[in-house]
């Protein structure tokens, strides 16, 4: 029962979005909306110069971001609490 209510609500929301997009004066709006909804890989394209929490690293090299240190035991970046 809960699943069918959720699907009905999701269908109504999708119908509202499609109806609003079709009435919009901007022709690129539906394409832009769909690209923003399904833009999952955009964050993967950005690379950092350092490694964050849980990333694998080599002890002795300064690969981890500030406030992180490479664990010699586990070989991944974790929070550096000081000495």
From Swiss-Prot:
Residues 1-21 form the signal peptide. Keywords: Amidation, Disulfide bond, Ion channel impairing toxin, Knottin, Neurotoxin, Presynaptic neurotoxin, Secreted, Signal, Toxin, Voltage-gated sodium channel impairing toxin. It is found in: Secreted. Pfam families: Toxin_12. InterPro entries: Huwentoxin-1, Huwentoxin_CS1. Transmembrane segments: none annotated. Expressed by the venom gland. The modification Leucine amide is found at residue 81. GO terms for molecular function: ion channel inhibitor activity; sodium channel regulator activity; toxin activity. GO terms for cellular component: extracellular region; host cell presynaptic membrane. Disulfide bonds join 50-65, 57-70, 64-77. Its main location: secreted. It comes from the Eukaryota. The keyword Electron transport does not apply. Residues 22-48 form a propeptide. Monomer. Selective antagonist of neuronal tetrodotoxin (TTX)-sensitive voltage-gated sodium channels (IC(50)=1270 nM on Nav1.1/SCN1A, 270 nM on Nav1.2/SCN2A, 491 nM on Nav1.3/SCN3A and 232 nM on Nav1.7/SCN9A). This toxin suppress Nav1.7 current amplitude without significantly altering the activation, inactivation, and repriming kinetics. Short extreme depolarizations partially activate the toxin-bound channel, indicating voltage-dependent inhibition of this toxin. This toxin increases the deactivation of the Nav1.7 current after extreme depolarizations. Belongs to the neurotoxin 10 (Hwtx-1) family. 15 (Hntx-3) subfamily. Negative results: has no activity on Nav1.4, Nav1.5, Nav1.8 and Nav1.9 sodium and calcium currents. The presence of a 'disulfide through disulfide knot' structurally defines this protein as a knottin. This is Hainantoxin-III 11. The lineage of its organism: Eukaryota, Metazoa, Ecdysozoa, Arthropoda, Chelicerata.
């Amino acid at each position: 029962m809960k699943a069918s209510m959720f699907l009905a609500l999701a269908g109504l929301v999708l119908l509202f979005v499609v109806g609003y997009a079709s009435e919009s004066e901007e022709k690129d709006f539906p394409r832009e909306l769909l690209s923003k909804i399904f833009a999952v890989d955009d964050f993967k394209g950005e690379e950092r110069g350092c490694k964050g929490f849980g990333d694998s690293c080599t002890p002795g090299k300064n690969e981890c971001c500030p406030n992180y240190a490479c664990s010699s035991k586990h070989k991944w970046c974790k929070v550096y609490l000081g000495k």
